[in-house]
Amino acid sequence: MDDMVSTEKDVFEPSLPDISSDTFKESNEKIAELSKKGYQLLKESEFDKAREAFFQILDIEDNNNYALVGLGDTSRKENKFNEAITFYNKCLSFYPSNNYALFGLADCYKALNQFSKAIDIWQQYLVHDDKNITVITRVADAYRKIHEFKKSKELYLKVLEMEKDNPYALIGLGHLSYDFKEYKDALGYWTRIYDLNLDNVDIRVLTAIGNCHRKLKTFEKGTFFFEKALERDPKNFYALFGLADCYRGMNQQAKSIEYWNMILELDPKNKVILTRAGDAYRTIGNYDEAVKYYTKALEIDFDIYAAIGLALICKCQGKFEEAVDRFKNLIRNDPRNSRLYVDLAECYSLMNKKDEAIKLLEDYLRNDGKNIQIRNLLERLRK
């Protein structure tokens, strides 16, 4: 979500001087002409033609910086990052302070998830231009990616001192806060982006704000932002998921099911969503539908929540022996899952096998003596 706002103008494209035919020799005129042509073709995504123009420059002048940067930019825009790195490094071997080569090289390392290398290159860039907000935000983003959160936050705040309401800094601070579960702070940063852009805000800002409300359990407020996102993109997974989960949180299971099923129309083999839909059907007592969804999920791959759902249905339907067998099997595969012991103990209790329930919970507490839920249930059973 790092590019939530509209793509910024590429301010790092080399600006060519006006070259007069009276001032420069014919070869320089040709280089200037080919450079302008190459960058224009690059803007038009005519990559092969742009590359041809830049190579023609190298035929005239070996190691021309415009040509080498242009070839790097062409490869970078084609996502051929290692090839681009070769061109940028060659340029820097002759022109160590070339900002365009430094910026392109850093962006390549960023795209390859080599964030430490990207930071090193951007730091070299900042030696020549330490007020460049675009580069500073990129360094902050990279620090966030390598979990250098303190440095990242310092740089984002530095950007906001230089330019109030800089969208990239606000977005980055939102991510930092969200990652540290500081959802109110994240909501504040992302809401500021929304307030500044309103109807033109990127859809990812809308879903990010919605997700903050989900985490804060202010579900009704969350639905507003997820619905606005769906107005932009009716098939947006994050908006559909957010609405389904908000309605689940508001205990409006029928509405929740509506959105789970909309996701499944787009992605019918999503076992997580199949299980969520199964849970919703189980909650409203539609066990037949719930079984269908859980079974579909398990046919794709084992899902413990789907398996638990089937066991809970047996428990709710009074099929206690089957429920006990299911919970025992699950415990064998996941012996530290306290929820399974609670459900199994409740089954024993409903079967008038209170002693077995008590023994089960006592055995569990030998390994996890501080589990409050288990201790409370054990206390109730002993009364």
Language model features with spans:
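Canonical tetratricopeptide repeat
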Residues: 36, 70, 104, 138, ...
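Register position in tetratricopeptide repeats
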Residues: 43, 77, 111, 145, ...
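Structural marker of alpha-solenoid helical repeat scaffolds
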Residues: 60, 94, 128-129, 162, ...
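Helix-start (N-cap) detector for alpha-helical repeat units in TPR-like alpha-solenoids
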Residues: 31, 65-66, 99-100, 133-134, ...
